[in-house]
A protein has these predicted regions:
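FNR-like FAD-binding dehydrogenase module
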Residues: 1-258
């Protein structure tokens, strides 16, 4: 993969969920699906078990009624030269305490050392420029993942004109990759760092506030050829950041950068 690419993860069902489904439908443990030569537990791991089931004559007929669980996409936080694929996953829960499909699988249901089924999706629109122009990385929450991959790639090329603008809730708990980011500052690999921790003061501060605070510097970087990368929540941050960039740079200039 390249910096900026996406991991499409295939979530699975927890052992408890599979066992409950089998008990409900009176399926004996370790029953073999003859056509697949695997156990029914293995066959059910990636199936949508919320499906309404019609009476089935055999396990093959049962499986024909079950669609696969949908995949979940995560920005990759590392580059191949690190020899590890890193994701940043926030565990999600609904109002009834049910864990999110992807986050529940990755943070709780999958066993340690268990292989994770995923494929890489090329994300060309977020790939790194192939020269040493400055870059401005803007993001919030788990969006730090995609930005970290870009910054890791830049540091390996000794490109130092990098600016990170990042927002989260609390510095104490939510400053992801703090030691790495601070080390980059110390070594000069990260020329600028602006942080917006919304819950650390009475008046909430977000990424778009930091952009407006640094409007003059932002315009200078863009005039010097900087490329802007934005990674984070579509609901909220993206529209606020877009509005701030239009206000600072003008709509025509921003369109040229897209």
């Amino acid at each position: 993969w390249q910096a900026g690419d996406i991991a499409e993860v295939q979530p699975g069902n927890s052992t408890a969920r599979i066992q409950a489904f089998m008990q409900k439908h009176h399926i004996a443990a370790q029953s073999i699906v003859e056509s697949l030569a695997i156990s029914i537990e293995q066959a059910l791991w990636d199936k949508n078990l919320n499906t309404e089931i019609e009476p089935f004559a055999n396990l093959e007929h049962l499986l024909e009624q079950l669609s696969p669980l949908p995949t979940r996409e995560y920005s990759i936080a590392s580059v191949p030269t690190q020899q590890v694929l890193r994701l940043v996953v926030r565990q999600q829960q609904d109002s009834e305490g049910e864990l999110g499909l992807g986050s529940g699988w990755l943070t709780q249901h999958a066993e340690l050392q268990q292989p994770i089924a995923l494929r890489i999706r090329t994300n060309e629109s977020f790939h790194l420029i192939n020269d040493n122009r400055p870059i401005i990385c803007i993001g919030n929450g788990t969006g730090i993942a995609g930005l970290m991959s870009l910054l890791h790639a830049r540091t390996r090329l000794d490109y130092t004109q990098n600016w990170l603008i990042f927002g989260e809730r609390q510095r104490e708990h939510d400053f992801f990759y703090q030691s790495t980011i601070e080390a980059w500052q110390t070594t000069g690999m990260l020329q600028r760092l602006d942080l917006a921790f919304s819950r650390d003061q009475a008046e909430k501060v977000y990424v778009h506030h930091k952009l407006r605070e640094q409007a003059t510097e932002l315009k200078t970087w863009v005039e010097n050829g900087a490329v802007i990368y934005v990674c984070g929540s579509i609901n909220g941050m993206a529209s606020d950041v877009d509005a701030a960039l239009i206000e600072i740079l003008g709509e025509e200039k921003l369109d040229q950068l897209r």
